[in-house]
Swiss-Prot record:
InterPro entries associated with the record: ATP-cone_dom, NrdR-like_N, RNR_NrdR-like
Lineage: Bacteria, Pseudomonadati, Pseudomonadota, Gammaproteobacteria, Enterobacterales
Designated name of the protein: Transcriptional repressor NrdR
Cofactors, names only: Zn(2+)
Signal peptide range: none
GO molecular function list: ATP binding; DNA binding; zinc ion binding
């Protein structure tokens, strides 16, 4: 790694420690030319698969879109933001675990419904009604009946 002070190429690692619950590494380095010390942080770059929409358009995975959809369903519901973030992280890790470069948007929708069902049944029904395009009250009733099973 280049020294940020003198831009020399030769630096050595003096100390390494895990930080952030083991998700990153903090390294103390020293330049072998100017002897200045500096800290670097190393994290794994986790690449999310691309999303294939129902009309075959491909787009990058958008975490904000996922979050806003879930928050819209959870609006005015008693679910903490920590639980929402854990659900989002669970969905992201499931998508990465597929090992695929592309995933259908339908898969993401199903994963969202799975998480919402665990978090809040009302939010699940709200999301499912839009996602599955419920046409009438009968479809709501059928979905609610499935929840009660």
């Amino acid at each position: 790694m280049h020294c940020p002070f003198c831009f020399a190429v030769d630096t050595k690692v003096i100390d390494s420690r895990l930080v952030g619950e083991g998700s990153s590494v903090r390294r103390r380095r020293q330049c072998l030319v100017c002897n200045e010390r500096f800290t670097t942080f190393e994290v794994a770059e986790l690449v999310m698969p691309r999303v294939v929409k129902s009309n075959d358009v491909r787009e990058p995975f958008n975490e904000e879109k996922l979050r806003s959809g879930m928050l819209r369903a959870l609006e005015k519901r008693p679910v903490s933001s920590d639980y929402v973030e854990m659900a989002i992280n669970h969905i992201k890790s499931q998508l990465r675990a597929t090992g695929e470069r592309e995933v259908p948007s339908k898969m993401i929708g199903n994963l969202v419904m799975e998480q919402l069902k665990k978090l809040d049944k009302v939010a699940y029904i709200r999301f499912a009604s839009v996602y599955r395009s419920f046409e009438d009250i009968k479809e709501f009733g059928e979905e609610i009946a499935r929840l009660e099973d």
